[in-house]
């Protein structure tokens, strides 16, 4: 009878499958993403929205130095969750790929083509010895011609297009909110509110200065970073809405108790 090798014997090399068909190093890389900051992406009728809770852990940190949303090209932007150093490497590579496409073909790269190139790089690091998978997920979004695109990539190199999605530690909660409240006909303004609402449910206190947000509208097709002043107004509006929801829930509960 063949002796089974313990799981620990399969998690030391990226190129070895376990008897159950698992690549443990890829699963560990996904765990790094699950511990990362929460990012939300939403496709709207007139553009796309990305929002990230930067999760500042110390008041001594200069908030402006923590970047979670990166412009790749004029019309493409990406949000990251996971290992910051890994994100920097892939973002730099994505920017190079975007410029190479412009030089080679005389036109901007599409969101889908860029997402696939990044996934090719990620996938290559799952079957080469002497390297480890990238411990991060990316939300890559932008405008292709006249349509919004939103892609999620994970450490294995898998690529999925979404209407709305979330990555990071708050993904389960954020996805529940998005599935309940997302509407394909919502505007970018409404999408920004929904993104902030989803982020607010993943943390005890959501501070405007800790939020990184960007949009791309289908009119100008250019990436636009949202200022803290604008985010403050959205956060206030969202918390006012949450307050009303809580009051209505309490009234409903009180009525049910009386009955």
Swiss-Prot record:
Pfam families noted in UniProt: Proteasome, Proteasome_A_N
Activity regulation details: The formation of the proteasomal ATPase PAN-20S proteasome complex, via the docking of the C-termini of PAN into the intersubunit pockets in the alpha-rings, triggers opening of the gate for substrate entry. Interconversion between the open-gate and close-gate conformations leads to a dynamic regulation of the 20S proteasome proteolysis activity.
Cross-referenced SUPFAM superfamilies: N-terminal nucleophile aminohydrolases (Ntn hydrolases)
A GO molecular-function annotation: threonine-type endopeptidase activity
Superkingdom to which the source organism belongs: Archaea
One record GO biological process: ubiquitin-dependent protein catabolic process
Keywords: Cytoplasm, Proteasome
Residues in coiled coil: none
Subcellular location: Cytoplasm
Classification via SMART domains: Proteasome_A_N
Entry's Gene Ontology cellular component terms: cytoplasm; proteasome core complex, alpha-subunit complex
Family the entry assigns: Belongs to the peptidase T1A family.
Subunit organization: The 20S proteasome core is composed of 14 alpha and 14 beta subunits that assemble into four stacked heptameric rings, resulting in a barrel-shaped structure. The two inner rings, each composed of seven catalytic beta subunits, are sandwiched by two outer rings, each composed of seven alpha subunits. The catalytic chamber with the active sites is on the inside of the barrel. Has a gated structure, the ends of the cylinder being occluded by the N-termini of the alpha-subunits. Is capped at one or both ends by the proteasome regulatory ATPase, PAN.
PANTHER family (UniProt xref): PROTEASOME SUBUNIT ALPHA/BETA (PTHR11599)
Entry function: Component of the proteasome core, a large protease complex with broad specificity involved in protein degradation.
Name assigned to this protein: Proteasome subunit alpha
Gene symbol of the encoding locus: psmA
């Amino acid at each position: 009878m063949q002796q089974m090798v313990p799981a620990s014997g399969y998690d030391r090399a990226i190129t070895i499958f376990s008897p159950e068909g698992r690549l443990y190093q890829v699963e560990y890389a996904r765990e790094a993403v699950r511990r990362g900051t929460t990012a939300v992406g939403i496709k709207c009728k007139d553009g796309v929205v990305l929002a990230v809770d930067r999760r500042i852990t110390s008041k001594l940190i200069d908030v402006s130095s923590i970047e979670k949303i990166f412009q790749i090209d004029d019309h493409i932007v990406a949000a990251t969750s996971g290992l910051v150093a890994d994100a920097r490497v892939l973002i730099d590579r994505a920017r190079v790929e975007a410029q190479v496409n412009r030089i080679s073909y005389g036109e901007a790269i599409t969101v889908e083509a860029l997402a696939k190139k990044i996934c090719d790089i990620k996938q290559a690091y799952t079957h080469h010895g002497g390297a480890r998978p990238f411990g991060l997920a990316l939300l890559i979004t932008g405008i292709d011609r006249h349509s919004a695109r939103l892609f999620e990539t994970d450490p294995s190199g898998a690529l999925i297009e979404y209407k709305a999605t979330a990555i990071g530690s708050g993904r389960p909660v954020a996805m529940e909110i998005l599935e309940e409240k997302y509407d394909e006909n919502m505007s970018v303004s409404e999408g920004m509110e929904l993104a902030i609402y989803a982020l607010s449910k993943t943390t005890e206190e959501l501070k405007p200065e800790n939020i990184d947000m960007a949009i791309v509208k289908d009119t100008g097709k250019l990436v636009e970073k949202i200022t803290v002043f604008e985010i403050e107004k959205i956060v206030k509006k969202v918390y006012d809405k949450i307050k009303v929801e809580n009051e209505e829930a309490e009234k409903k509960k009180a009525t049910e108790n009386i009955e």
